[in-house]
């Protein structure tokens, strides 16, 4: 297939070659386990057996395409342990390993055996290829176009997984990342290689949304919080759709577009727009529903992905080229991409406002939408400004930084690492100055000269502050509850009683809203308008709005009182027949007469079960007027009267930013801190020990002894390493014995001593840096692991009846029933490390790996995760609850330290904690008591084990084996237990405390003695927390019971 040297088709050819340069079954081929297959493909011309298989797959799917530069992208994309291969075994087939293991890229001493589930002969490979062909050949062209590439990027590993094949390592000698992680990383690096070949620069570009937590917190209703989160995700998604269309999905490093719900949804919509066969669309929909949406087709019914999963930070790897027609030329200047990002961001917001205007105009018969339409017209100028700011930074790479003439420079393996750290540094500098979005509005002019439009009760002082954000002047001022309906009509806000009901349903009496907060409230009422951003440039605003108006679907978002009442709703559903006979309130048992969907999975599963889930608990059992009636009713039918409390859970991974820079802080959280890297030589002993263990364990087979020996020589400050020379010489001799004539000639030219010197230099460079040198493979592996972890997290939230407000990257904000929160924190923390009991969605988590069918992928076992849990009253102002949860987590995980076991002795550590709060009571539970958190498979059982203990104690209390007075009698024992330095005395006191409160003679409940000595210290923390672990365990249970009462 001939292509123009600068054409888009040639660029896509490069990327297809990158994705397919190694076959997914490479490990089996190079270890001679696919002998039948390679024999059957002997007519395919290639140097090596696995290249023969790869070439056959490429030819079958995309025709005869070729790219000589894939080797450079391959090398630059690889992880640091595979770079060792470029230095040690090169093209010599040295240190071959016929065993196939897959190791965790973050924790290389944890591994899985890889079995024999792969296409073993040509017929099975052809069957697999036909599955790809069936979906790829519907793009109405035989040539490779952007749609075909986007589709292949999506389905490549999904079809492999669906065929129930295993996932192999990219290299059997250093099996630390999967073949798919390697292939997708190579495709990403091809953006630089292609660009540099054309004498253009390559770029790393980052986008950071400023003040995400603050923006999300500015709301009075759950609907406001959820839509704020969705805006953060959707605006950035709109930005990156341009890059996906110009260059392909591989340019997005963070978040990965593999297993990504937004990307899967976008591509499905694009295929529909292209009028692809419905049968093919159904097959693709089945694949993504099964493996990307956890088997839930809510995204189809809602016509948007239900969860805001795009984080506030994006990283892209870009070629310095811009397309003109089907040809590429160099970007006009270095700021081109920065300007493009800002332009797209502002454009996305304005399109959204345009769509909201259009929709409200078409819905003016509804009182709320009529009000929205009026305000949008009056505040048109104000709404040209986005309510969020973004920072955009980039760094560039030139050809001479990577290449020396046409060959890779000897230090090219460090270039990506250098550029990424430069990008991080640029962001750190820019954070010194913060400009709020409000500062871009001309508020002084509006308020001073009475230009601010106001609808409703006019302010006597010129303006009133918005009650939702508390920052901007309000343009809607609702009358108070007294005579609300009458005043609404008199003030011209509503035309009749029907309008009043519509408005009151969305805006409460006494509420005041600024233009931005009204926009959020309106978008929360019709979230499908987010399609304007989600579809990028696929459809016009007018077409999207008309389609939405033509399909009238009501969308429910749960309130805090709904979350608090979930147990009561469930019990009412179980006893619906008897309770509906007794109920005076007919609407509670009304059957749904209209289509309704919710972002809350619990609602959708129970909508048609006989109890009206759309009723507002605040107007029924939480109402002062009806509370006594419902208390009596529920008691008669043995239904739990609901507690007015719910749990707000916030979670954030520890040191993820450091991990992406290759720093070792996640491995020794608190023992090594981020600030230590200003002078990391002071932590040389800990750092070198970790790095050496990682580098040794990253190998598999004969290479391990060689690496050990080289590191021993470095440790001994030896310039020469005779033992390593001997090992290397013996390996050369052994390979030469079985080598063909061509390989033997290469081996005869090897200067063994020089090769060993290169190895010494390589390892010294890494040890001097005191961190892992990051590569695209490192980033792609972590980014895709975060996506898989996110899918598990969403499944857990739904399992525990919660509602997701935000779930971008490693962050989570969710509401759960109080009685589910301990189980959720335990399971979530373990799942993040890669361990679970039972299946979660389509995944099983097994000792640091996620298994999807038979394919294993790495989880993030060495990364800690911290949680804040606020037990809040449904009527508490959400703004304060959200901010409290943020401050509690951000400050607590930095300031609270506790003792952990490291290398046989106790050290002070921090992070990886769960902080609980209810009213004035706060407790802290460490989620791990050693560093690294995981160092062997047995360590997985210890993660969140203290939460297990708390749950077991709660179970004994709930079952009546132990009295709840145990938690309050503790105060009599507390000072003795805390003051005791002798374990036997502490154990005696604890046993006596439990025995005194046991309701049965023999209650077997013990606390591991290692917990007695755990102490917490708090640095500059304004909140009082007990210093001993036993007190924190007791206080945590008090907090939970306080929320359940």
UniProtKB/Swiss-Prot annotation:
Residues noted as binding ADP in the record, renumbered to the chain: 229, 233, 811
Keyword Cytoplasm appears in the UniProt entry: yes
Recorded GO MF terms: metal ion binding; nucleotide binding
Organism: Saccharolobus solfataricus (strain ATCC 35092 / DSM 1617 / JCM 11322 / P2)
Binding site for Zn(2+): 466, 469, 514, 517
Cofactor: Ca(2+); Zn(2+)
Lineage, broadest ranks: Archaea, Thermoproteota, Thermoprotei, Sulfolobales, Sulfolobaceae
Family: Belongs to the CRISPR system Cmr2 family.
Protein name per the record: CRISPR system CMR subunit Cmr2
Function, as annotated: CRISPR (clustered regularly interspaced short palindromic repeat) is an adaptive immune system that provides protection against mobile genetic elements (viruses, transposable elements and conjugative plasmids). CRISPR clusters contain spacers, sequences complementary to antecedent mobile elements, and target invading nucleic acids. CRISPR clusters are transcribed and processed into CRISPR RNA (crRNA). The CMR complex degrades RNA complementary to the crRNA (target RNA) within UA dinucleotides, generating 3'-OH and 5'-phosphate ends.
Co-factor binding details: Binds 2 Ca(2+) per subunit.
């Amino acid at each position: 297939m001939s292509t123009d040297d600068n054409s888009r088709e040639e660029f896509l050819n490069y990327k297809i070659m990158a994705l397919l340069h190694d076959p997914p079954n490479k490990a089996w081929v190079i270890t001679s386990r696919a002998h039948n297959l390679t024999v059957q493909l002997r007519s395919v011309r290639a140097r090596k057996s696995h290249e023969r298989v790869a070439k056959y797959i490429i030819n079958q799917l995309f025709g005869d395409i070729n790219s000589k530069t894939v080797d450079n992208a391959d090398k630059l994309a690889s992880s640091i342990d595979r770079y060792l291969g470029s230095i040690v075994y090169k093209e010599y087939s040295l240190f071959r390993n016929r065993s196939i293991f897959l190791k965790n890229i973050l924790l290389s001493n944890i591994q899985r055996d890889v079995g024999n589930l792969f296409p073993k002969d040509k017929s099975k490979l052809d069957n697999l290829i036909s599955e790809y062909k069936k979906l790829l050949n519907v793009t109405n062209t035989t040539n490779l176009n952007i749609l075909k590439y986007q589709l292949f990027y999506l389905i490549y590993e999904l079809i492999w997984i669906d065929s129930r094949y295993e996932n192999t390592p990219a290299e059997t000698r250093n099996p630390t990342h999967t073949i798919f992680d390697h292939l997708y990383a190579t495709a990403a690096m091809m953006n630089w290689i292609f660009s540099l070949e054309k004498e253009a620069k390559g770029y790393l570009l980052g986008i950071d949304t400023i003040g995400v937590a603050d923006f999300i917190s500015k709301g009075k209703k759950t609907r406001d919080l959820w839509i704020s989160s969705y805006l953060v995700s959707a605006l950035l998604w709109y930005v990156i759709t341009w890059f996906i269309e110009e260059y392909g999905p591989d340019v997005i490093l963070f978040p990965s577009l593999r297993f990504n719900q937004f990307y899967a949804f976008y591509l499905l919509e694009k295929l529909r727009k292209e009028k692809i066969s419905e049968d093919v669309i159904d097959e693709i929909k089945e694949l993504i529903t099964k493996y990307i949406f956890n088997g839930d087709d809510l995204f189809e019914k809602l016509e948007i992905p239900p969860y805001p999963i795009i984080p506030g930070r994006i990283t892209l790897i870009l070629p310095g080229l811009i397309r003109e027609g089907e040809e590429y030329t160099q970007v006009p200047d270095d700021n081109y991409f920065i300007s493009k990002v800002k332009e797209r961001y502002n454009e996305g917001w304005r399109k959204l406002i345009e769509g909201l205007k259009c929709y409200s105009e078409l819905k003016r018969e509804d009182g709320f939408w009529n009000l929205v339409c009026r305000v949008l017209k009056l505040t048109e100028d104000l709404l040209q400004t986005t309510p969020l700011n973004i920072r955009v930074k980039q760094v560039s790479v030139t050809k001479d930084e990577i290449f020396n003439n046409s060959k890779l420079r000897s230090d090219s393996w460090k270039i990506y690492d250098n550029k990424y750290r430069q990008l991080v540094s640029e962001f750190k500098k820019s954070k010194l100055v913060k400009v709020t979005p409000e500062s871009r509005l001309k508020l002084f002019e509006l308020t001073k000269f009475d230009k601010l439009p106001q609808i409703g009760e006019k302010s006597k002082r010129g303006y009133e502050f918005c009650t939702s954000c508390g920052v901007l002047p309000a343009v809607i001022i609702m009358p108070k509850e007294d005579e609300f309906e009458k005043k609404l009509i008199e003030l011209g806000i509503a035309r009749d009683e029907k309008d009043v009901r519509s408005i009151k349903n969305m805006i409460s009496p006494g509420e005041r809203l600024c233009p931005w907060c009204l926009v959020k409230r309106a978008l929360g009422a019709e979230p499908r308008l987010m399609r304007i951003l989600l579809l990028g440039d696929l459809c016009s605003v007018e077409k999207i709005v008309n389609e939405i108006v033509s399909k009238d679907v009501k969308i429910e978002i749960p309130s805090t009182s709904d979350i608090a009442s979930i147990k009561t709703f469930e019990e009412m559903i179980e006893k619906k027949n008897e309770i509906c006979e007794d109920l005076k309130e007919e609407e509670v048992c009304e059957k749904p007469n209209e289509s309704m969907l919710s972002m809350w999975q619990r609602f959708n599963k129970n909508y048609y079960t006989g109890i009206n889930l759309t009723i507002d608990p605040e107007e029924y059992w939480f109402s002062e007027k009806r509370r006594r009636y419902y208390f009596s009713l529920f008691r008669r039918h043995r239904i739990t009267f609901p507690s007015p409390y719910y749990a707000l859970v916030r979670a954030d991974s520890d040191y993820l930013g450091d991990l992406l820079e290759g720093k070792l802080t996640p491995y020794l959280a608190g023992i090594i801190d981020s600030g230590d890297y200003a002078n990391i030589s002071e932590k040389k002993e800990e750092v070198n020990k970790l790095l050496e263990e990682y580098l040794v364990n990253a190998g598999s087979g004969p290479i391990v002894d060689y690496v050990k020996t080289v590191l021993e020589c470095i440790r001994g400050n030896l310039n020469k390493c005779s033992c390593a020379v001997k090992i290397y010489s013996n390996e050369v001799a052994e390979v030469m014995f079985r080598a063909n004539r061509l390989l033997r000639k290469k081996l005869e030219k090897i200067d063994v001593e020089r090769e060993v010197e290169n190895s010494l230099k390589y390892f010294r460079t890494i040890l001097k840096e005191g961190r892992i040198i990051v590569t695209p493979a490192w980033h792609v592996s972590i980014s895709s692991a975060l996506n898989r972890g996110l899918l598990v997290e969403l499944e857990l939230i739904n399992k525990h009846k919660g509602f997701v407000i935000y779930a971008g990257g490693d962050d989570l904000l969710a509401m759960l029933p109080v009685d589910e929160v301990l189980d959720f924190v335990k399971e979530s923390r373990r799942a993040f490390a890669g361990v679970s009991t039972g299946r979660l969605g389509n995944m099983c988590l097994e000792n640091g790996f996620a298994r999807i069918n038979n394919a294993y992928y790495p989880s993030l076992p060495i990364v800690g995760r911290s949680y804040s849990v606020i037990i809040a009253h449904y009527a508490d102002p959400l703004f304060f609850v959200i901010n409290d949860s943020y401050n509690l987590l951000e400050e607590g995980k930095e300031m609270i330290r506790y003792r952990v076991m490291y290398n046989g002795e106790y050290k002070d550590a921090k992070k990886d904690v769960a902080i609980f709060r209810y009213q004035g009571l706060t407790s802290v539970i460490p989620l791990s008591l050693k560093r690294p958190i995981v160092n062997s498979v047995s360590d997985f059982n210890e993660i969140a084990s203290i939460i297990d203990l708390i749950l077991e104690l709660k179970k004994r209390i709930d079952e009546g084996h132990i009295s709840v007075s145990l938690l309050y009698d503790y105060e009599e024992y507390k000072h003795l237990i805390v003051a005791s330095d002798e374990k036997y005395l502490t154990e005696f006191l604890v046993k006596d405390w439990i025995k005194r409160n046991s309701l049965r003679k023999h209650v077997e409940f013990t606390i591991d003695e290692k917990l007695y000595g755990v102490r917490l210290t708090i640095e500059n923390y304004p909140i009082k927390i007990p210093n001993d672990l036993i007190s924190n365990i007791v206080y945590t249970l008090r907090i939970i019971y306080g929320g359940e009462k």
